[in-house]
Every structure is written in C-alpha cells, then in structure tokens.
Amino acid sequence: MFVDQVKISLKAGDGGNGITAYRREKYVPFGGPAGGDGGKGASVVFEVDEGLRTLLDFRYQRHFKASKGENGQSSNMHGKNAEDLVLKVPPGTIIKNVETDEVLADLVEDGQRAVVAKGGRGGRGNSRFATPRNPAPDFSEKGEPGEELDVSLELKLLADVGLVGFPSVGKSTLLSIVSKAKPKIGAYHFTTIKPNLGVVSTPDQRSFVMADLPGLIEGASDGVGLGHQFLRHVERTKVIVHMIDMSGSEGREPIEDYKVINQELAAYEQRLEDRPQIVVANKMDLPESQDNLNLFKEEIGEDVPVIPVSTITRDNIDQLLYAIADKLEEYKDVDFTVEEEESVGINRVLYKHTPSQDKFTISRDDDGAYVVSGNAIERMFKMTDFNSDPAVRRFARQMRSMGIDDALRERGCKNGDIVRILGGEFEFVE
C-alpha cells in the first residue's frame, strides 16, 4: 500500500535541570557554588533516505517524543546532551506545520536534514548566577521545554514516469503487466485512489520507476474529484504517459479526452504543458478502436506520435517501454524538480521552527483575574523552580524588568488582585 500524506505529533526533548550545589572539599572553607548545568534536550530531525519510497512507517506510529537532557551534577559537572531523534523519510517529502500550513522543509536529496522541533536548552546551575553581591546563590534553573508541534508529511512522488488519463483507461492494468506492482483493478471508475509505484525493466535491461496515478476528470485543476490530490504527484515526473481509451467504450470521444486532460495539466501548472509526453492509444483489441485512432491522428496531426497498445492482449507493450526509456534518456539531464522549486522560491530547507518572540499580552478572565501570556514570559515561567524562594524572587525581578508590573498597573491591577501565567496563580503585591 502507498501512503503519500500523514499527520504526526512531535515533541522535542526538554533540557535537563541545573542544580543547586556547593563545593565541600576539605581545605576549601569558602567553596562557593558548584551546581552544573543541565544537558540540551534532543531535537527532532528529519533525514532523507533514498532507500525509502513511502510514508508507510508513519501510519502506525503518529507520536514521536525525543529524549530529555540529563540534569546537572555537583562539582560543576554538566548534564549530557540528549541525542537527536532522527526520523527517516523518502526523497520528495514536504513537511508542513499543521496549525499554520507553513512549509518547514522540502527534502529532496539523500542525506539532507532539517531540524523541525528544537530541543530545549539545559537549565543553568547555581554557579552561573554567582555575582560579587551574591557569591553563593541558592537557586538554579529548570531545563527549557522542547518544542512541540503537529506536522503533516506530504510525499511528492519522485517517479520517472507518471501515467495520466481519465478513469478506467487501463493505467493500473498497464502497471501490473510491466512491473511487479499489484494495483487494485476493477470495472468501475476511481479504482485507484492512491498512487501505486512499480519498477519497470525493458527487454534491453533499462529500468525506470512508473507511477499509476488516480484518474482525472474535468475540473481537476480546481480540485474536482481527486484533482489536486492527483496533480501534485505529476509535478516531479520526468515523462508523462497519457493513456486514452481509443474504443470510446465509456461514451467519450478520444480526442476530447486528450484535450481535457492536457487542459487540466496546464491549468494546474503551466510547465506541465511542456513536459515530455507519450500518447498511448489503449484498448486497440476492441471494435471501432482502429477507426477512432485514424480520426484521432488526423485531428492532432503528425507532430504528436501515438503508440497503439492493448493491455489485455499485451500487443505492442514492449515497443511502448522502449519509447518511454528512450524519452527518459533524452531528458535525463533535465532536472524538472529544481526548476519548479526555483520558480516558486522554495529552498530545500526553508524553515526551522522558531516561536515568535512577542513580548507579552495581558487579558482578563471571566472571574476578573489578569492573564499574562507570551513566548518569552511563558518560557521563563517553565524554567523557574517555584519550590525555591530565591528562584521565585528572581522570576519577580524578571517580570519587572520586562515591564509586566507597570503594564498590569496600567490595566487597573491593584494590590491583592490575581495574576495568572499558564497554570500558575500569583497575587499582585505593590
């Protein structure tokens, strides 16, 4: 089974906690602070593995949590950094933030990496806070929480050849007889609803990857039917094999099928109109196919070669494979993927998840309590050990230095009012 789109949840590792400790060696009467820093939490990293072809592994595991950094130790020993969690994906994987729909990375080349969820910084030990005024601080810092987000993985096929055409023209049947792929084949429309991949070998030992793609209908470029779901896979194929039911058994005219499909390709992406294309006249074993083929050739002209085949009797299949292999060799040095990436301004690694560092905002709850929110203040809240009075006093000083106290007063906050930050409640004291 081919899986080309999946949503997963990521949680980078929290940083290790710094500790409060002091030197206690013999002959060191004023040892001072000796608490070590916590280690860095593991990041979630995606890496391209060219041996993979699908996102199937992510179908059975949707939640990924990276390791926490080790806590600091006494004698100024720092905790060990956690090893990054590396998730392998096939070439052509696009990673998007589910909440914002922002593209985080477009991974194409083998070994290419992108950090999508960054591990938390390790908390600082008490030795980091020593000053001339306070040479032996009795507080330390908790580790920074790792980033947490939901992402969608979308695999754009990197097949060499894409089979396109109306439903039930024989695309799946062709793939099944020229490769070991076993797509679902049925006597009804849209038997194929997910792409199927197959490795095809020609009689002269040339090989390529062929993709049987869901059938198109008129309006696909506007999202009708399986439209966009189908068309995004065509973008990275080097050669398009356009299959047409030359028998007209579905009640459609072959020439109209040909025109509609090409119009939909061009409407979705202008460059697809100029992509190398091989026209295949299928079902030549049925009555009226030859007459329809003659009319078809007259209509499109001699400049467009047409290869007549029958996927049922397998007539002319080898000649079709030779023609595809020849066309691939002709365009082997053309990188359509790079052209498309440059045309839309997409770098191969676009973005590393970084929360916006807005200062803070103040709102009111229904019970009248003041709610302070913002990435910076929430980060400080999470890294403060509220079991330590000195750490709490430091947090209060940080709030004052950020201007939160003054902002609360401007909003009407008075002595004794409740202030909330995340899950914590504080009493405002003048």
UniProtKB/Swiss-Prot annotation:
Mg(2+) binds at residues 172, 192. GTP binds at residues 165-172, 190-194, 212-215, 282-285, 310-312. It is an enzyme of class 3 (hydrolase). It comes from the Bacteria. It is found in: Cytoplasm. Keywords: Cytoplasm, GTP-binding, Hydrolase, Magnesium, Metal-binding, Nucleotide-binding. Residues 352-430 form the OCT domain. PROSITE patterns: G_OBG, GTP1_OBG, OBG, OCT. Pfam families: DUF1967, GTP1_OBG, MMR_HSR1. Residues 1-158 form the Obg domain. Its cofactor is Mg(2+). Residues 118-145 are annotated as: Disordered. GO terms for molecular function: GTP binding; GTPase activity; magnesium ion binding. The keyword Transport does not apply. Residues 159-329 form the OBG-type G domain. Monomer. Belongs to the TRAFAC class OBG-HflX-like GTPase superfamily. OBG GTPase family. PANTHER family: DEVELOPMENTALLY REGULATED GTP-BINDING PROTEIN-RELATED (PTHR11702), MITOCHONDRIAL RIBOSOME-ASSOCIATED GTPASE 2 (PTHR11702:SF31). An essential GTPase which binds GTP, GDP and possibly (p)ppGpp with moderate affinity, with high nucleotide exchange rates and a fairly low GTP hydrolysis rate. Plays a role in control of the cell cycle, stress response, ribosome biogenesis and in those bacteria that undergo differentiation, in morphogenesis control. HAMAP family: GTPase_Obg. This is GTPase Obg. It comes from Staphylococcus aureus (strain NCTC 8325 / PS 47). The lineage of its organism: Bacteria, Bacillati, Bacillota, Bacilli, Bacillales.
